[in-house]
C-alpha cells in the first residue's frame, strides 16, 4: 500500500490528486474494457472508468449502475464473482486524518464476503495532470511524498446488527526502516538467466482441447458440493442470467452447452471468459472423445462465432437508422427481446429503443436459426440502408452479445 502524507492530497475519481497537479492511479489491462470506453491500446486508467459511471465518487465505485451499462460490463470483466451485484471497485481508503492510502491493486468489496483482487492485471502509474498526459510507471522511491505501508487494517461496522463495534488500531509497518542504516553498496553474485523469447502468436484458434468439457456437460449437471463452490455458482448464474441467445440451431444441446460454446468463442477472440470455471468443474480427463465428435464441436464453435458476427453486422445497420418501419412485437421470443433491450441500452440506437427491439428481434431470431447473412442483408435492404462498414467497438459488441 502507498500512503501519501503530502498536505492537500486527496482521492478524486479513483486517483490520488497531489497539490502539484500530478495524479497517481492504477491502470487495468483489459482490451475489452478499453474498447468499450473508446480508449486506444489495451490499458484502462481507473479515472476513465470512474468518470464513465457519471457518479461523483472518490476511492470506491459501485459496480451496478442502471444509468451506466458500462459499469455492468466492467463488473463482468473484473469481478471474480461478477453476479454479486452489491460489490464495489475500491482502489484505496482515506484515513480519519484525511491521509489517502492507495492499495497496491484494486479490489472488489462485497457486503456478504471478503474482498478480492480484480481478475485483470494492474499497474500503478503517475500522470502530470488530470488529463492523463505524460503517463509513466510510478515508483515510490522517486516520490518522497509517498511511503510504502505493509498493511492497513480497516474496520467494517455491521449496521444491521447495531449491537457493538470492533475497533482495531491502524497498523503501519514502513518498509523503508532499513534506509537509515549505513550499508555499503552490494552487488548480486547470481547470474541472471536470459529472459525467454515471447511466444509466437497462434495464427488460428484450436478448439480441440475444449471439446471434452462440451460433451461432459451433456452427461452431468454441475452441483454445489461436487465441485468448487465459486466456479459452480458462476457457471449456474451465468446460465440463468446471461444465456439469452441460442446461437446454434440444435435443439438437442443443453442450455449449459450453449453457454460453454459462447465462452469458447470469447476465448478464441482473446476476450474475458469463464472457460476456466468450466475446467475447474469438469475434471475428468480420462473421458475420451472420437475424432468425429471433436470435429463436430469445432464446427459448432465456428457456427456460433459466425452467427454472433452476423448479428453485430445487422444490428449496426439497424442502430444507424433513425426511422424504422413499425412491426408487430414478437411475443414468442422474450429472451431475444430482453437481450436486445440490454444491447441497445449499451449501444444506443438513432431511434427509440423499443422500436429497434421490435424490428431487430425477428432478424436476430432468423440468424440464430441459421439464416445466411447475404439473405438477411437483402431483406434489410428493402427497409433500411445496410452499412457495409463494421464501425467502432466491434469486439466489445461481440463480447456483450456473448455475455447477455
From Swiss-Prot:
Cross-referenced InterPro entries: Herpes_BTRF1
Entry superkingdom: Viruses
Cited Pfam families: Herpes_BTRF1
Family label: Belongs to the lymphocryptovirus BTRF1 family.
Name of the protein this chain belongs to: Uncharacterized protein BTRF1
Organism: Epstein-Barr virus (strain B95-8)
Amino acid at each position: 500500500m502507498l500512503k501519501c502524507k503530502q498536505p492537500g492530497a486527496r482521492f478524486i475519481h479513483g486517483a490520488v490528486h497531489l497539490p502539484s497537479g500530478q495524479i497517481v492511479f492504477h491502470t487495468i489491462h483489459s482490451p475489452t474494457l478499453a474498447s468499450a470506453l473508446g480508449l486506444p491500446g489495451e490499458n484502462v486508467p481507473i479515472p476513465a472508468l470512474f468518470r464513465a459511471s457519471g457518479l461523483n465518487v472518490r476511492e470506491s465505485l459501485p459496480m451496478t449502475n442502471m444509468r451506466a451499462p458500462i459499469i455492468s460490463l466492467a463488473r463482468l470483466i473484473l469481478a471474480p464473482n461478477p453476479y454479486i451485484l452489491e460489490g464495489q471497485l475500491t482502489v484505496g481508503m482515506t484515513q480519519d486524518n484525511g491521509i489517502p492510502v492507495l492499495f497496491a491493486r484494486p479490489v472488489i468489496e462485497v457486503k456478504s464476503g471478503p474482498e478480492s483482487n480484480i481478475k485483470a492485471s494492474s499497474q500503478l502509474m503517475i500522470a502530470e495532470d488530470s488529463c492523463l498526459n505524460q503517463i509513466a510507471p510510478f515508483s515510490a522511491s522517486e516520490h518522497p511524498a509517498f511511503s510504502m505501508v505493509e498493511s492497513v487494517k480497516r474496520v467494517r461496522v455491521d449496521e444491521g446488527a447495531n449491537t457493538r463495534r470492533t475497533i482495531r488500531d491502524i497498523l503501519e509497518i514502513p518498509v523503508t526502516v532499513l534506509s537509515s542504516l549505513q550499508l555499503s553498496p552490494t552487488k548480486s553474485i547470481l547470474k541472471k538467466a536470459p529472459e525467454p523469447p515471447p511466444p509466437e502468436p497462434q495464427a488460428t484458434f484450436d478448439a480441440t482441447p475444449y471439446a471434452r468439457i462440451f460433451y461432459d456437460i451433456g452427461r452431468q449437471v454441475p452441483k454445489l458440493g461436487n465441485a468448487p463452490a465459486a466456479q459452480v455458482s458462476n457457471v449456474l448464474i451465468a446460465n440463468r442470467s446471461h444465456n439469452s441467445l441460442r446461437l446454434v440451431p440444435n435443439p438437442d444441446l443443453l442450455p449449459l452447452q450453449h453457454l460453454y460454446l459462447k465462452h469458447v468463442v470469447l476465448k478464441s477472440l482473446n476476450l474475458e471468459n469463464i472457460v476456466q470455471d468450466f475446467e475447474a468443474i469438469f475434471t475428468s480427463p480420462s473421458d475420451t472423445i472420437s475424432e468425429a465428435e471433436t470435429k463436430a464441436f469445432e464446427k459448432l464453435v465456428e457456427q456460433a462465432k459466425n452467427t454472433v458476427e452476423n448479428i453485430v453486422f445487422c444490428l449496426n445497420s439497424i442502430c444507424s437508422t433513425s426511422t424504422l418501419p413499425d412491426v408487430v412485437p414478437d411475443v414468442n421470443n422474450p429472451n431475444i427481446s430482453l437481450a436486445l433491450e440490454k444491447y441497445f441500452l449499451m449501444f444506443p440506437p438513432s431511434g427509440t429503443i423499443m422500436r429497434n427491439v421490435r424490428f431487430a428481434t425477428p432478424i436476430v431470431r432468423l440468424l440464430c436459426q441459421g439464416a445466411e447473412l447475404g439473405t438477411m442483408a437483402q431483406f434489410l435492404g428493402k427497409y433500411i440502408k445496410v452499412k457495409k462498414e463494421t464501425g467502432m467497438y466491434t469486439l466489445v459488441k461481440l463480447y456483450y452479445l456473448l455475455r447477455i
